[in-house]
Regions:
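Surface beta-strand/loop "capping" patches
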Residues: 168-195
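Residue-level detector of short, conserved catalytic/binding motifs and their immediate flanks
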Residues: 18, 29, 41-42
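C-terminal catalytic region of ATP-dependent kinase domains
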Residues: 37-173
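Residues immediately flanking
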Residues: 1, 14, 48
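Catalytic-loop signature of eukaryotic-like protein kinases
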Residues: 23-35
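Conserved kinase catalytic-core helix
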Residues: 10-24
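Single conserved hydrophobic/aromatic residue that forms the stacking wall/gate
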Residues: 1-9
Length: 195
């Protein structure tokens, strides 16, 4: 049914976003649903303060770790839902195609870097007041340095995001190219509109 398909796409897009902007704080997850079950469980994307901490980050490796991921307190956080989905061949096949589709056509540097720059331009005039009032960041030059690092990470991310996908799904270059052709077909079917 169409609604279930949309829900599955949203859940995949959630995981794609967590991976693309490597947000290793996957221990803090929240989900919601309606009490009448007209809307089934959906992930809530929030608390992304660990995102973009490294352009090389591999969050998929944590979500698909059947042993569990060690928490700071020594306990293991289990990602049973995602491990179960990963073991489903149909889900994995569509996830790979969707991942390439989203990262190639929407989370690419032609789109993200201008968006990032516009966000920086929006808050830049307020930074001196921010620093004067709160003392954080410690100086304007420190803030500019951090912005430069974030931009560099964002610019380098496409290459590493591809490598993470290939590693976690054991994809050769030839297999990746096959999935990329399917992603291109998906883009053409959607008329270049994100769906």
């Amino acid at each position: 049914d169409r609604r279930q398909r949309q829900m599955c796409i949203r859940d995949r897009d959630y995981l794609i976003a967590r991976e693309y902007f490597p947000d290793a704080d996957m221990f803090n997850q929240k989900y919601w649903r309606t009490t009448d079950y007209k809307v089934r469980w959906r992930a809530i994307f929030y608390d992304s303060d660990f995102a973009l901490s490294s352009e090389r980050g591999d969050v998929l490796g944590h979500y698909f770790n059947v042993v569990g991921v060690p928490s700071a307190d020594g306990s293991l956080s289990q990602m049973d839902l995602y491990c179960g989905l990963r073991s489903n061949e149909e889900w994995s096949d569509y996830f790979i195609t969707r991942y390439i589709y989203v990262t190639k056509y929407y989370l690419n540097n032609d789109r993200l870097l201008p968006l990032f720059d516009s966000m920086v331009d929006t808050i830049q005039p307020e930074m001196d007041r921010q620093i004067a009032r709160w003392g954080r960041p410690e100086s304007r030059s420190h803030w500019e340095n951090e912005i430069s690092k974030l931009r560099s990470m964002l610019a380098a991310r496409p290459q590493y995001a591809k490598q993470c996908l290939q590693y976690n799904f054991k994809l050769s270059e030839a297999q990746y190219a096959e999935y990329e052709a399917k992603a291109d077909e998906m883009f053409n079917q959607n008329g270049g509109v994100f769906k």
